[in-house]
Amino acid sequence: MDPAYETVDELIDLGTRVGTVKDGKLSCNSGDEYDNVSGAVSGLLNFYEFSGFANVTWRHLIMVLVGLIFIFLAIRYDFEPLLLIPIGFGILIGNIPMFQAVDFNLKLGIYEPGSVLNILYQGVVQGWYPPLIFLGIGAMTDFSSLISNPKLMLLGAAAQVGIFLTFLGALFFGFLPPEAGAIAIIGGADGPTAIFISSKLANGLNVMPNGEVVKNLIGPIAIAAYSYMALVPVIQPPVIKLLTSKKERQRRMKPPRAVSKLEKILFPIVGLLLTAYIAPSALPLLGMLFFGNLLKESGVTKRLANTASNALIDVITMLLGITVGASTQADVFLTPSSIQIFILGAASFVIATAGGVMGAKLMNVFLKKENKINPMIGAAGVSAVPDSARVVQHMGLQEDPSNHLLMHAMAPNVSGVIGSAVAAGILLSFLM
């Protein structure tokens, strides 16, 4: 029986109007129809609850904007596109808000055990990706300029001063020693090294003797390191000009000598033994770097060298970029600690650049006139390969169109790669 009402009342279930109006009276639908409508509305509400629109916050929107800026800078201004596009897109993926419940796991997010992103992210957390990237770097790096002028290795070491000074600065900001060590490595401008050391020291799992848990800073540190790597052409020139005169920037250097094949083969072997004995904790990075270089220089493993320097490093770079980007979820990334990390990272990068330049000027005090070096190449001791060397080359051509410094600058540049890995190993040995 359909009951009738003299007035039109609304029968609402889950926000849905139920019934039909006829001749000024409201009649209810049958029970089946009521259940169908109720079920449909309930389904729509469930759908809405699971959508990103129901769970989005202003923090998510800010991070989406950051991801879009990364992608824009990579495409529009060619700022490290191989890094910033995967990271930027990963930030977009990581900041799609999803339904959260204690007893409900969709296995979609990067921090949800068993999800695809979480499995891929283990390459970052467990420190698998950085050594594989070092393998590719070694397979594509020519150490001839460093072998021909070994004293320039000191410039790569001088640039690491930014790491240790920033370590003290991070302690002053109130970070725990392991966190400070992970933040300090940003000054090396070496993304893989920064990720490797932060996965060991600032992974959110380590516990201090007083019971305090170390924060998970992998995402902020990685984003800061790669951001400053992309901004090398913006950050370094003002620092170099501030610390050098026009005459110094115009200084010419003797052409590097020719390097024999035997020297090229011996270098990765001797280099591994020397550096790994100094900093055994950096063996995963140094071992893969020199192994990749031996593949290149031996002349009998070209296929392996080509795979390491092309397909392998490209795949790992994509996985590393997209997982690091996805790990920067709004609730994890937008914290006061992240702002402090970016400030310390910028300071570390500037100090490293200045340390390399001042180290070159100090070396000139002890060198004969014909052997003096252009102090600008000291800035290439920052291990953003080959961007720092290109900055020096560009500035040299601006001062003197016939003065080519690229090959000279590559010596401290590749030395900086080794130096940052050694510095990371030293920090690990003190802080683990």
Task: Describe the function of each predicted region.
Residues 224-300:
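Membrane-embedded hairpin module used as a gating/binding unit in multi-pass transport
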Residues 143-167, 224, 331-357, 409-413:
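Entry/N-cap segments of selected transmembrane alpha helices
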Residues 216-234, 342-352, 377-380:
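Alpha-helical transmembrane segments
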Residues 272-360:
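Transmembrane helical segments that form the transport core of multi-pass membrane transport proteins
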Residues 122, 126-127, 134-140, 155-165, ...:
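Alpha-helical membrane segments and immediately flanking helix-loop junctions
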Residues 1-31, 37-38:
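Conserved N-terminal/central alpha/beta ligand/cofactor-binding core
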Residues 28, 33-106, 112:
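N-terminal alpha-helical transmembrane segments of multi-pass membrane transport
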Residues 96-118, 135-147, 169-180, 331:
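Transmembrane alpha-helix boundary signature
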